[in-house]
């Protein structure tokens, strides 16, 4: 617990440059599409952590960046968010980046993650005494699947009794979490990532997904599905929450990160699981309405949006 009596969340994972090119006309694959390019600091863990900090959680981040202009921008964004920056800078390397192409509706058509530096450098950082001390001082741990599997296992070992929350990042990276599913207090993912983890087919029903994840050792999860119902289960109880329709979706980037950050903030503040998920969905809905993966909103805006999220329904 920090001196300000805010619970402290120590996070390990991505903090890099997000580039997004969005078509302003109906997207045509394999062709040049008129559009708009935007870039901003992002990364799964970093986006979620900024949201949690907005909601009253003290935050510390361990990431990796290069000694370039982009790295300086990322460092400034971490400081601006009021997050303790325990990241390591490799002066001779380029900062990781994520580049996405969006269609005219703001949905991702394709994306490239240039993040080899995480693979090489993050596992070594977890052996540092400073990191062990930071984990010991935290109330909870948060990671994303930008870490390779061996680093995730090491972090789970360092956490000991502390809650561990994780973000799946992508279907390709979600499978890295398989060996620590039993250590997680909640895993945040979308339907595609859940199917990658379980090996189920595209037609799998919610109950099947829930049962397969439980059988794999994961006892708590939140699974988003775009405009479809969000599935959340906690031990023996499973819920669905229908997201309200969002007029004028600007950009889907960061919506899943916001879901994680908002839910984690609620859980760390003692909110019941199903209500914390509603808070996470509120943050996600607000994010969908902006061209930023980490928007800033007032408490009044948050409360107004929360009133639009329906109560959770038990999955029977």
Predicted regions and their residues:
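Conserved phosphate-binding/catalytic region of the ribokinase-like
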Residues: 1-11, 33, 205-316
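Glycine-rich phosphate/adenosyl-contacting loop at the front of the ribokinase-like
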Residues: 1-64, 69-80, 242, 248-249, ...
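Short beta-strand scaffold segments in enzyme catalytic cores
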Residues: 50, 97-101, 110, 229-233
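A glycine-rich helix N-cap at a beta->alpha junction
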Residues: 77-93
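Short gly/ser/thr-rich secondary-structure transition/capping motifs
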Residues: 82, 121-126, 166-172
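Conserved phosphate-binding/catalytic loop of the ribokinase/pfkB sugar-kinase fold
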Residues: 90, 100-140, 145
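Glycosyltransferases and closely related glycan-assembly transferases
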Residues: 133-136, 151-163
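Conserved phosphate/ATP/ADP-binding segment of small-molecule kinases
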Residues: 159-163, 168-240
């Amino acid at each position: 617990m920090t001196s300000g009596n805010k619970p402290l969340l120590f996070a390990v994972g991505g903090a890099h440059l997000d580039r997004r090119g969005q078509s302003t006309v109906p997207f045509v694959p394999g062709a040049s599409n008129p559009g708009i390019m935007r870039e901003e600091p992002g990364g799964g863990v970093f986006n979620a952590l900024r949201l949690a900090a907005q909601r009253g959680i003290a935050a510390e981040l361990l990431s990796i960046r290069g000694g370039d202009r982009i790295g300086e921008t990322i460092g400034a964004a971490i400081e601006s968010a009021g997050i303790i920056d325990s990241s390591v800078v490799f002066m001779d390397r380029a900062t990781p980046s994520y580049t996405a192409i969006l269609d005219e509706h703001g949905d991702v058509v394709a994306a490239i993650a240039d993040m080899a530096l995480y693979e090489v450098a993050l596992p070594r950082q977890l052996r540092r005494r400073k990191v062990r001390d930071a984990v010991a001082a935290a109330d909870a741990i948060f990671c994303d699947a930008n870490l390779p599997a061996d680093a995730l296992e090491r972090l789970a070992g360092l956490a000991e009794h502390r809650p561990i929350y994780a973000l799946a990042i992508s279907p390709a990276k979600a499978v890295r979490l398989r060996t620590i599913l039993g250590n997680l207090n909640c895993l945040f993912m979308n339907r595609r990532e859940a199917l990658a983890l379980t090996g189920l087919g595209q037609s799998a029903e919610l109950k099947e997904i829930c049962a397969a994840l439980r059988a794999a050792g994961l006892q708590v999860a939140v699974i988003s599905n775009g405009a479809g119902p969000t599935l959340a289960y906690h031990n023996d109880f499973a819920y669905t929450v229908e997201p309200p329709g969002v007029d004028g979706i600007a950009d889907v980037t960061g919506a899943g990160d916001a879901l994680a950050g908002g839910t984690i903030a609620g859980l760390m503040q003692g909110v019941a699981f199903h209500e914390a998920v509603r808070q996470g969905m509120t943050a996600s809905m607000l994010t969908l309405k902006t061209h930023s993966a980490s928007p800033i909103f007032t408490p009044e805006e948050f409360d107004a949006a929360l009133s639009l999220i329906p109560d959770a329904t038990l999955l029977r």
